[in-house]
Structure formats: structure tokens, C-alpha cells
């Protein structure tokens, strides 16, 4: 079994306020593991995931700022930066 890669999660908007920090390093192989680690490390973000493990509609995830992701099975690589944003409607 290989070690989990270290991934940096950057928080923006409401997630930053709820996390109480700008970023967090987590060990995760998939987006699902990453979300679980974020909820564990940042109690203010409890409820980030739906009962089926997917991200709630209140948040968006972007890997390396290039693509938005929703598949919790998607793998992450060592050194990836994953952005967690509010999915607020703008005006």
C-alpha cells in the first residue's frame, strides 16, 4: 500500500471563514479522502459532504485551478492544489 500524497487545500470565501485558515495540507489519494480530511481538521466545515460522500451544492472544488470536480473517486497527485470555494450566486 503506497503512502497518501500530500495535497494543499486552499479555502476561499465562506469556506475560509468557516475553516479559520487560508489553507491546509492533507494526505489523500482521492477527492473523497480529501473532503473527509478537511472535515476532520476543520470542524467549521462539518457538513461539507452529503450522506453519499459527495460535496454539497454549497461548495465547489477545483484541482489546480483548471477544472471543477465533483467525482469523489477522482485521484489527486502529490503537490496538487485543490481550491474549495463557495458556490454562491453572484449578482
PLM ranges: what are they?
Residues 1-90:
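Ubiquitin-like/PB1-type beta-grasp interaction modules and other compact soluble beta-rich domains
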Amino acid at each position: 500500500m503506497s503512502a497518501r500524497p500530500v495535497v494543499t487545500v486552499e479555502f476561499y470565501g465562506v469556506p475560509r471563514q468557516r475553516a479559520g485558515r487560508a489553507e491546509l495540507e492533507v494526505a489523500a489519494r482521492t477527492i473523497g479522502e480529501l473532503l473527509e480530511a478537511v472535515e476532520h481538521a476543520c470542524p467549521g466545515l462539518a457538513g461539507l459532504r452529503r450522506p453519499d460522500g459527495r460535496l454539497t451544492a454549497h461548495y465547489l472544488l477545483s484541482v489546480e485551478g483548471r477544472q471543477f470536480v465533483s467525482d469523489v473517486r477522482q485521484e489527486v497527485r502529490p503537490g496538487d492544489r485543490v481550491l474549495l470555494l463557495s458556490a454562491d450566486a453572484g449578482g
